[in-house]
Regions:
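Cytosolic covalent-transfer regions centered on His/Cys nucleophiles
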Residues: 1-190
């Protein structure tokens, strides 16, 4: 899945002013409405807050992926907020420190396809240390977009990174838990 097809530099924010989940979700919904990705900002916000109340969306690795499926969503897309200083976000074992927040907007018709593909692509990509480090080091929207493209090849002379095993395992666990939560939510809504 091409992540860049689902976002835009105008939907990427470095150190946004809001540091609580609800305030950040509300703030990130505004540019989605401005780009006509969502037709009704408040309906979309309520769908995200409802999903947040059903289960945590912090997935470890400094990542949170709040999301909403609503008739107000005109096309699948996401906003990205990056923080130098971590914010607190509800996780499976209490609040987690988060530095990357991907707010997903999913049309109901794509709840089982695009939604799951996007979650899997994001969590898989962000288990790669190189990608996560580039994203967290981004100082501009363009640098963040470049990190998401994952086009920068690794140096040929670099030895293989054996430290990837733990992030891959954690990413797989987080993906499985997130998919299970998403499927149970989709079944409950459907």
């Amino acid at each position: 899945m091409n992540l860049l097809a689902l976002t835009h530099p105008d939907l990427v924010f470095i150190n946004p002013p809001h540091r609580t989940p609800e305030a950040l979700i509300r703030w990130l919904a505004e540019p989605l409405a401005g780009r006509n990705i969502i037709s009704d900002e408040e309906t979309f916000i309520q769908s995200v807050l409802q999903r947040e109340s059903e289960g945590p969306t912090a997935l470890g690795e400094a990542l949170a992926v709040p999301h909403g499926k609503s008739e107000a969503v005109q096309q699948a897309a996401f906003c990205l907020a990056l923080f130098d200083d971590p914010i607190r976000w509800p996780g499976l074992d209490g609040d987690e420190e988060v530095r990357m927040v991907f707010l997903l907007a999913i049309p109901p018709a794509e709840a089982g396809s695009t939604h799951m593909q996007l979650l899997t692509t994001l969590t898989s990509l962000l288990t790669e240390d190189r990608v996560r480090e580039r994203l967290l080091a981004a100082r501009t929207r363009e640098e963040a977009m470049s990190a998401l493209s994952a086009e920068e090849p690794q140096k040929q002379d670099a030895p293989p990174d054996r430290s990837l095993l733990i992030p891959v395992i954690l990413g797989s666990i987080a993906t499985a838990a997130f998919l299970q939560a998403g499927l149970s939510w989709a079944c409950a809504v459907g």
